[in-house]
Amino acid sequence: MAESPTNSIVREDQTATLVELLRTRATKQADDLAYTFLIDGKKEGVSVTYSQLDGLARAIAAFLQKSQVKGERALLLYPQGVEVVAAFCGCLYAGVIAIPVPPPESGRMKRTLPRLRSIVKDARASIVLTTERILETIANVQDQFPEFETMEWIDTDKIDYQLGEKWQDPQIDKEAIAYLQYTSGSTSTPKGVMLTHGNLVFHCGNLKKACGYEDNSVTVTWMPYFHDYGLVEGLMVPLYNGTPCYIMSPFAFVKRPLRWLQSISKYRATHSQAPNFAYDLSVRKIKPKQLETFDLSCWEAAGNAAEPINPKVMEKFNETFAPAGFRWNTFAPAYGLAEATLLVSTKPKLTEPVIGYFDSQALERDKIVAVSKDGEGVRAIASCGQLVCETQVAIVNPDTKERCAPDQVGEIWVSDPSVTQGYWERPDATEESFNAYITGTNEGPFLRTGDLGFLQEGELYINGRIKDLIIIHGTNHYPQDIEWTVQQLHPELRPDYGAAFSILVKGEEKLVVVQEIERRAKDIDPEAMLPEIKQAIAEEHELQVHALVLAKPGNILKTSSGKIQRRACKASFLAGELGVIADWSENPQITAKFRDLEGEVESLAASLKNNK
């Protein structure tokens, strides 16, 4: 392994672009380890120093510069690894706008290609940087997508490394767009967030301070490069900080979750991040004897973000892995979004996480009433920490756009230099989301996050998405709470694979719950589970279920970061497209009736369009 990094001699705060930063690292820390890929999350594969990464980036950039494509958009289609980091940096070195996207999966083309195609259309991308294997996968379906045939497909493994000698500085500044981060689309069609070099450099500096990165920090990451959490904190912050990063594939993590923790132990990682489900999965997969095989006492910041944080999962993980050296204060719950580059808030390193306890009925009325932990009707919410550096947050009524009282839940509005320019070629959406002002004041502009939450004693709490909120009889219900209630009833109900949403029935909102059953479930009676689930929801949430579906695995869609796509699940339910194992409804013909209703609406829309 390379010697200890000498990153203290690099002034990151004096660099305007990622190009300047990496060029400086390549000069001052030429032989220091930058990235190592772990094959199957275990065996060391490709490693690069900063000098080698700079050489790869210059070669890729010089190849692109031959075609004079500065300002063009390039898709990055790669498996997780060092290659995609080099391609990302190569785009920046050429002044090409990078677009990290999930690579198509040969066994799931129908599910993965439509989103890729929509991104190509939206960004008007003309270049694809990829590998030979992915080129072969695409070749089988390329004739079905005319957009792909007009693009230049480049296998970066075949680019001559010596070409880097012909690289020319792209002459860009901090205002240049570095990449487009396509939002995960949990509640809407994905949009390309425009992130400048200035956004990225500034925010990496903020994360270095807020998350406690030091000269001896080490990162282990399996978060996908095409997700903002994986790209910014997983891959770019180590580059900014000048410290080593060990990269795992997300597939390796899902297949063998404990290799993530074993890698943290082996490489003495101080920083590693994951969504809530990863901590839950690790608890469910660990066996007592395995705890003896690793030491987690090195871990200083266990980032927890990208999906709702469940305090019970945090407590269970801490209880399970404390014998392996994990500490409660290692947890670092956080909140963020691509539109703010990444994090809005996080818990400072090695401070105690804060769990708030609130009256659940008051929260349903958007009121904040703190209560004791042991009372009845209590909802525990994990704080997402304190605001990052210069970040300012306002809690605002999403309808009136007035600032909420301190004891009210509202929409989270953000102001910070890390807030991005807006959405690629979407001026209306940009105006709506990025240029909000508080009614009756000159306060603004703010970024509207679409998330509900509140501030209490300097801690930011998240309550869910506005568009996911279930409102029945004037009372607010959070889908993640209902889903959690269901999934605790039986081990064969898949954790994190349920969706609660409402549908309109005769002018009234009604509750629908869809829950997947484990693939290897045996000796269960799904029909017998239905009344048990209905009763639990009635007791815990005082809600009557209108329709309940126990579905086969693969019916609950998730975003690239693991968020439940409740609107997609609702659409599948209404279209009668769910793979049903068992179901119940107040109206046995509900699916067919809603299909008919959708057909009527589509016919009416077509009629109105034709009569314009």
Task: Give each language-model segment a name.
Residues Q262-S265, S272, D416, Q421-G422, ...:
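AMP-binding/adenylate-forming catalytic core of the ANL superfamily
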Residues L21-V48, A178-L180, T187, G336, ...:
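AMP-dependent adenylate-forming
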Residues V201-V218, D228-T270, K285-Q290:
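Conserved AMP-binding/adenylation subdomain of ANL enzymes
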Residues T15, D496-Y497, I503-L504, E509, ...:
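AMP-binding/adenylate-forming catalytic domain of the ANL superfamily
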Residues A30-L33, W153-I154, Y161-Y182, S188-T189, ...:
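Conserved pre-ATP/AMP-binding loop-to-beta segment of ANL
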Residues A34-A86, S106-P114, K166-Q171, G192-G198:
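Conserved AMP-binding/adenylate-forming core of the ANL superfamily
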Residues I381-D407, E411-I472, E598-E600:
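Conserved ATP-binding/catalytic segment of the ANL
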Residues A269-Q273, K285-G377, Q392, T400-E402:
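Gly/Ser/Thr-rich phosphate-binding loop
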